[in-house]
């Protein structure tokens, strides 16, 4: 029978000093036999996805204590990728994932907490906490702050919504010289109306949906908007549930409730199956690979490639379409609705466990609105946006008049009526990416699935932006942005500005972009990232020259630099001859801090999730 971890610091005469300090935090005599549960919050006023979380930790804590536990809250950092975008701040985004994972480990292990409720939301916070949960392997429930409502532009005549907007629309309009200042300002003011994670199928929402599929979050976690009153129930339930999980593990020796028991290889495969089916952000590939490594699960790019070849695209939301946002996915039945369709297509392992419903199959039976779910589920998925700008959680209770249960032409489709039988994400291989690269096929126009173009080579994102805005990129080009990988950046910047500017220049469907960096979940078009190995690790992307021919073939999962092997060998030899300057960007001016240098020293390429390789410390 496992012992409560907290007894290490709460029991025995030798812990009198520790108990004295615990008492100073408010604990009483009767609390020292209860489980101590860490409420891992991530409130910050810097990030709209986290600005409303200040009081939600206390909400969870009250439920924990009412259920017989002791709640102790702390905060992690949280970087807003949208605010950090387009300048040196983006270098810090991906490395913050490791910092978050480490800080959770430090706090939980230093204070011997028995379990956690992880209150996450935005891009690197959910992955960082997920990595920590796998690492610590103590009972945990994830509950996110929830998605932002989509922005709306309404008709001045009848007030009806004539367009839905998000952050990416604001960026594209601002860069389009044909858009007036007044129109650009209207979009800017309308794009992000409420608290919550940005409203499309971007990285934050993708990851919060995937925690449902993995089994560590409650139904609706990824889709019910942050402002809706019914989201409060997820936080309350999480507080009660984590105490139950604690008792099952520590008092009943039930290890099935532990993260590593739930997040098995089959669970990661289920999550990736969902990811491909819903066209999730390409960043999810990095984060699932990283979390799997922390869990000790052998889940690799080859598994992702295999899954991507057999799973159809069953759901589309912005940026893959301007018709639907996350609030529309919720109205169509949320993640359990997509999982229900995948289950009926025999594409899931329904025996995988979760924290709330026994097995995935049981959860689908209870929550899939097209699979016979009851009145409670039917009501829950009618939770709608309120249409009122606010930074306050649970501030409205609007409901949709009807559910979207149309699986032929609706937001969520069944397999027979899939958006495409080829899934929403794909892994490409070739001499430009021997270890793979990632493309979000859900966001690529079918006319570009096979594309050949001329290389336009840039040594940094900044140079690429200057080149695109300076009209140095033309239709038919393949923009190469290199030395932006985990080591080369360092930090593997997102390329939302280059992709947005290509669209603003009318090149979104006539150009491609290939990089060892990564993309915001808001990027779409023929944009291919995560080139592995990266340029700084000797990847062939570092040998591409201006004007080279690049061949892209998504149906056959191929990306190829049309240069002979002899020529490539000569280029590689010439690069090696540069000595210490080999595999380094030419004439790039970039200040790299000591913190980022430390990250770069241990970072791996994207095919391994850009995690740290601690074996390098032994060299």
Curated annotation (Swiss-Prot):
Chain residues that bind [2Fe-2S] cluster: 122, 198
Biochemical pathway: Amino-acid biosynthesis; L-isoleucine biosynthesis; L-isoleucine from 2-oxobutanoate: step 3/4; Amino-acid biosynthesis; L-valine biosynthesis; L-valine from pyruvate: step 3/4
Pfam annotation, one family: ILV_EDD_C
Modification type N6-carboxylysine: residues: 124
InterPro entries assigned to the protein according to its UniProt record, in alphabetical order: Dihydro-acid_dehy_C (IPR042096), DihydroxyA_deHydtase (IPR004404), DiOHA_6PGluconate_deHydtase_CS (IPR020558), ILV_EDD_C (IPR056740), ILV_EDD_N (IPR000581), IlvD/EDD_N (IPR037237)
Cofactor or coenzyme needed: [2Fe-2S] cluster; Mg(2+)
EC code(s) of this entry: 4.2.1.9
Active site: 520
Reactions performed catalytically: (2R)-2,3-dihydroxy-3-methylbutanoate = 3-methyl-2-oxobutanoate + H2O; (2R,3R)-2,3-dihydroxy-3-methylpentanoate = (S)-3-methyl-2-oxopentanoate + H2O
Enzyme class: lyase
Residues noted as binding Mg(2+) in the record, renumbered to the chain: 81, 123-124, 494
Family statement: Belongs to the IlvD/Edd family.
Assembly information from the UniProt record: Homodimer.
NCBIfam families: ilvD, PRK12448.1
Protein name: Dihydroxy-acid dehydratase 1
Native source species: Bordetella pertussis (strain Tohama I / ATCC BAA-589 / NCTC 13251)
Originating gene: ilvD1
């Amino acid at each position: 029978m496992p012992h409560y971890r907290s007894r290490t610091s709460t029991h025995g005469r030798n812990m009198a000093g520790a108990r004295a300090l615990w008492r100073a935090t408010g604990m009483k005599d009767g609390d020292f036999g209860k489980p101590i549960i860490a409420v891992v919050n991530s409130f910050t006023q810097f990030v709209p996805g986290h600005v409303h979380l200040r009081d939600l930790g206390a909400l969870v804590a009250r439920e924990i204590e009412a259920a017989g536990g002791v709640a102790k809250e702390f905060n992690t950092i949280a970087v807003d990728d949208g605010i950090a975008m387009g300048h040196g701040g983006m270098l810090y985004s991906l490395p913050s994932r490791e910092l978050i994972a480490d800080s959770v480990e430090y706090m939980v292990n230093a204070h011997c907490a028995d379990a956690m409720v992880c209150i996450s939301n935005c891009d690197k916070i959910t992955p960082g906490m997920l990595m920590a949960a796998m690492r610590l392997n103590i009972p945990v429930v994830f509950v996110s702050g929830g998605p932002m409502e989509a922005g709306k532009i309404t008709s001045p005549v009848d007030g009806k919504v004539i367009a839905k907007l998000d952050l990416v629309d604001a960026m594209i309009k601002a860069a389009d010289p044909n858009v007036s200042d007044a129109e650009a300002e209207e979009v800017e003011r309308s794009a992000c109306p409420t608290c919550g994670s940005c409203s499309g199928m971007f990285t934050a929402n993708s990851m919060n949906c995937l925690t449902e599929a993995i089994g560590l979050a409650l139904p609706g976690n990824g889709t019910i908007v942050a402002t809706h009153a019914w989201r409060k129930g997820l936080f309350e339930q999480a507080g009660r549930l984590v105490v139950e999980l604690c008792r099952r593990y520590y008092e009943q020796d039930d290890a099935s409730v532990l993260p590593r028991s739930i997040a098995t290889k089959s669970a990661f495969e289920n999550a990736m199956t969902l990811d491909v089916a819903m066209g999730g952000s390409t960043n999810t590939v990095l984060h699932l690979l990283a979390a799997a490594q922390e869990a000790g699960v052998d889940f690799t790019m080859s598994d992702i490639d295999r899954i991507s070849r057999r799973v159809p695209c069953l759901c589309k939301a912005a940026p893959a379409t301007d018709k639907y946002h996350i609030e529309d996915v919720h109205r169509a039945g949320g993640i359990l609705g997509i999982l229900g369709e995948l289950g009926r297509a025999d594409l899931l392992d329904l025996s995988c466990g979760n924290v709330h419903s026994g097995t995935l199959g049981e959860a689908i039976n209870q929550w899939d609105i097209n699979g016979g779910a009851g009145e409670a589920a039917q009501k829950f998925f009618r939770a709608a946006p309120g249409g009122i700008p606010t930074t306050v959680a649970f501030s409205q209770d609007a409901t949709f008049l009807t559910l979207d249960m149309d699986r032929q032409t609706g937001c969520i489709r069944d397999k027979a009526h899939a958006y495409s039988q080829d899934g929403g994400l794909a892994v490409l291989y070739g001499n430009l990416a021997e270890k793979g690269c990632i493309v979000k096929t859900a966001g690529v126009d079918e006319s570009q699935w096979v594309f050949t173009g001329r290389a336009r080579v840039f040594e940094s994102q900044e140079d690429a932006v200057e080149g695109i805005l300076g009209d140095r990129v033309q239709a038919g080009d393949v923009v190469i942005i290199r030395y932006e990988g985990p080591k080369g950046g360092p930090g593997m910047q997102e390329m939302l500005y280059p992709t947005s500017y290509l669209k603003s220049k009318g090149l979104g469907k006539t150009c491609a972009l290939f990089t060892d960096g990564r993309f915001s979940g808001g990027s779409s078009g023929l944009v291919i990232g995560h080139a592995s190995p990266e340029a700084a690790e000797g990847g062939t992307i570092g040998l591409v020259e201006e004007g080279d021919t690049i061949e892209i073939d998504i149906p056959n999962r191929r990306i190829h630099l049309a240069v002979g092997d002899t020529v490539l060998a000569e280029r590689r030899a010439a690069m090696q001859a540069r000595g210490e300057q080999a595999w380094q960007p030419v004439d790039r001016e970039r200040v790299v801090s000591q913190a980022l240098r430390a990250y770069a020293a241990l970072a791996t390429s994207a095919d391994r999730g850009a995690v740290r390789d601690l074996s390098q410390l032994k060299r």
